[in-house]
UniProtKB/Swiss-Prot annotation:
One of its GO terms (biological process) is amino acid catabolic process. Keywords: Activator, DNA-binding, Metal-binding, Nucleus, Phosphoprotein, Transcription, Transcription regulation, Zinc. It comes from Saccharomyces cerevisiae (strain ATCC 204508 / S288c) (Baker's yeast). InterPro entries: Transcr_Regulatory_Elem (IPR051615), Transcription_factor_dom_fun (IPR007219), Zn2-C6_fun-type_DNA-bd_sf (IPR036864), Zn2Cys6_DnaBD (IPR001138). Gene3D superfamilies: Zn(2)-C6 fungal-type DNA-binding domain. The modification Phosphoserine is found at S164, S166. Present with 396 molecules/cell in log phase SD medium. This is Activatory protein CHA4. GO terms for cellular component: nucleus. Pfam families: Fungal_trans (PF04082), Zn_clus (PF00172). One of its GO terms (molecular function) is sequence-specific DNA binding. It comes from the Eukaryota. Activates the CHA1 gene for L-serine dehydratase. Binds to the DNA sequence 5'-GVGGARAYRTRATTCCRC-3'. Residues 44-70 bind DNA.
Length: 648
């Protein structure tokens, strides 16, 4: 395969080809001088290494004396000097090849194959067929020009042949780059807007209500399903740390987090509790004006980095809506967040990010972006399970590596940590949740496909339950739990328990539709309901009230009650879950709406469904109940009778 580079579709780097005048082979000179006897000018390798005088015979006297192999160098390259232009050309070629290999290594096999084919085709049909091209496996020495080719005329010719500027890249199958769909326009001076943002953040950092709200959020709700936020970089940017990129915090993100934090405050803190909806509306107004450029066109001129806070804001607002029972709005906002994440290439390998973000990225920046993306991935899969819908972010098109533990701020943020004495680990639970989400992603279409028989679906469900059982068994010691450990537990740790609630929501959601037909599903759900009861009991014994409860806890209780309503699951715990959802200290509207909806359902069969227009929550069969009529017609138009022949 020829490796003389012409610009492949994946790179913008163009390497000028070397002119044939500078690629004159050394072997041609050797052939022309075969008939001219010449005396060896270099001593053998042993004499040169030992600095002995060589008699130039083969073998020489020294090699005979010391019984070593006598090897002479065939070429004397001491006087060969290559022009600076030629050396720079070779260096340019090497850089180009390295860039291509890096891009290919982070691309799919199809893209890599196409790129390599392009390289081969461009080499086979080059514009200089008589040139000596450096081939794969050939030494660089054999392709270097002889000293006679380094004259001034050839250097001039080479300089003239080099393009003055790189031509535009071919790009991907789209006319737009992978990092953004924006058409680049001349940017205006953003210094004034930046200064205004910093003044606004400075004022917010002095607000007692904002500070109290942020403290409640990070102490009680973080990390949970908010893994797309990295606490340390957010707080550093919020408090004006010059060593942290300012775009990790924005006005709308502060208000969105404050809305979630103030929502779990005590109702006796009247001013703070009432600000929750105000903060929510403020964040929503700012972010939607930016996205849809309503009175604010800054997003069109902003960098991809500044959109990170927009993604985080949208997801915070989505979870606020989920807690309020406003599921359609939550679906819209989260969908926007995942679209923007793809638009800026957040799902790509860091090797590709160097062409996405305008500013200089440090290793810490790479790690934070990885954390944000995988947090989005978990949020997407959780929302999909809650609503019984398919996911937007999939592992198959996510090339960004898994996140690792990030450094914490040693002092100064004690008010924003649940237990300042304990080091919070988020990377390990996140990695485990990624694996669990991947398992659900694989089995969803198989378990809930109406094209499979009940026997086939039950077999897939059994395999799914086994995979998730193995997942739970293989958890690290700090995350492991059992029914017995829950019964004996006295200390509830929300920074760990969210992993357990996520597990229960996944398992109950996947087994709930089959409790009528499959005995194993009934037994599993019954066991999970018992474990949930003990987990909620530990919470109540420690904290007494439920102001600081999470969406995880509410949805787990709702799923448990729905299963017990089937009359196939023991109802011993039903009243306990109902008492939890109707507790006056529980601040989420979702719980109140569920209780009211359940009571109205006893008297009115036409009552409004809890989930609004997303009325079939947790009904994956709706999502995978495909009508293949149109698809079959299209297949017939495309393939005619070919498919019939293949199927036979």
């Amino acid at each position: 395969m020829m490796l003389e580079p012409s610009p492949p579709p994946l790179t913008t780097t163009v390497t000028p080809s070397l002119p044939s005048s500078l690629k004159k082979s050394v072997t041609d000179n050797d052939q022309n001088n075969n008939n001219v006897p010449r005396k060896r000018k270099l001593a053998c390798q042993n004499c040169r290494r030992r600095r002995r005088k060589c008699n130039m015979e083969k073998p020489c006297s020294n090699c005979i004396k010391f019984r070593t192999e006598c090897v002479f160098t065939q070429q004397d390259l001491r006087n060969k000097r290559y022009s600076t232009t030629y050396v720079e050309a070779l260096q340019s070629q090497i850089r180009s090849l390295k860039e291509q290999l890096q891009i290919l290594s982070s691309s799919s096999s199809t893209i890599a194959s196409n790129a390599l084919s392009s390289l081969k085709n461009n080499s086979d049909h080059g514009d200089a067929p008589n040139e000596k091209i450096l081939k794969y496996g050939e030494t660089a020495q054999s392709a270097l020009p002889s000293s006679e080719s380094n004259d001034e005329n050839e250097s001039d010719a080479f300089t003239k042949k080099m393009p003055s500027e790189s031509p535009p890249p071919v790009g991907t199958n789209s006319i737009y780059p992978s990092n953004s769909l924006s058409i680049i326009k001349k940017k205006t001076d953003g210094s004034t807007r930046y200064q205004q943002q910093q003044v606004s953040l400075k004022n917010l950092s002095r607000s007692p209500l904002i500070l109290r709200s942020l403290s409640l959020f990070f102490k009680w709700l973080y990390p949970g399903h908010y893994l797309f936020i990295h606490r340390e970089t957010f707080l550093s940017a919020f408090f004006g740390d010059t060593n942290t990129k300012s775009y990790y915090c924005s006005e709308e993100l502060v208000f969105a987090i404050a809305a979630l934090g103030s929502l779990i405050s005590y109702k006796s803190e009247t001013e703070l509790f009432q600000q929750s909806e105000v903060f929510y509306q403020r964040a929503k107004t700012i972010v939607l004006k930016k996205i849809f450029q309503l009175e604010d066109s800054s997003l069109a001129e902003s960098s991809s980095s500044s959109k990170l806070a927009i993604i985080q804001t949208l997801l915070c607002l989505a979870f606020y809506d989920i807690g309020s029972g406003e599921n359609p709005m939550a679906w819209y906002l989260s969908g926007l967040a995942f679209r923007i994440a793809h638009e800026i290439g957040l799902h790509l390998n860091p090797e590709a990010w160097s062409n996405v973000y305008e500013d200089e990225l440090s290793i810490m920046d790479f790690e934070v972006r990885s954390r944000i993306y995988w947090g989005c991935y978990i949020a997407d899969h959780l929302i999909a399970i809650l609503f019984g819908r398919s996911t937007s972010l999939r592992l198959s098109n996510s090339t960004v590596p898994e996140t690792d533990e990030l450094p914490e701020i040693e002092t100064g943020i004690e008010e924003y940590i649940y237990d300042p004495k304990v080091i919070l680990s988020t990377a390990n639970p996140l990695k485990k949740l990624i694996v669990l989400s991947r398992i659900t992603e694989i089995f969803a279409s198989k378990i809930f496909s109406p094209n499979e028989t009940l026997l086939q679906r039950s077999e897939y469900l059994a395999k799914f339950n086994l995979e998730v059982y193995n997942w739970r068994r293989d958890l690290p010691p700090e995350l492991q739990w059992t029914k017995r450990s829950l019964m004996e537990m006295t200390d509830f740790n929300p920074t760990i328990a969210y992993v357990w609630f996520h597990y229960y929501i996944v398992l109950i959601s996947y087994n709930k539709p089959f409790i009528y037909e499959i005995k194993q599903s009934r037994e599993l759900v019954e066991g999970y309901v018992d474990e949930l009861y003990y987990l909620l009991k530990v919470w109540k014994n420690k904290f007494k009230t439920f102001e600081k409860a999470t969406i995880y806890m509410i949805y787990s209780a709702i799923l448990a009650i729905q299963c017990m309503k089937s009359n196939l699951i023991k109802k011993d715990r039903k009243q306990d879950f109902l008492n939890f959802l109707s507790a006056p200290t529980l601040n989420y509207e979702l719980a109140r709406k569920f209780i009211e909806n359940s009571e109205d359902a006893l008297h009115n069969s036409e009552t409004m469904d809890l989930l609004g227009t997303l009325s079939h929550g947790n009904d994956f069969a709706l999502e995978y109940n495909f009508d293949f009529t149109l698809l079959n017609e299209i297949d017939m138009l495309i393939g005619g009778n070919t498919n019939d022949g293949l199927s036979k």
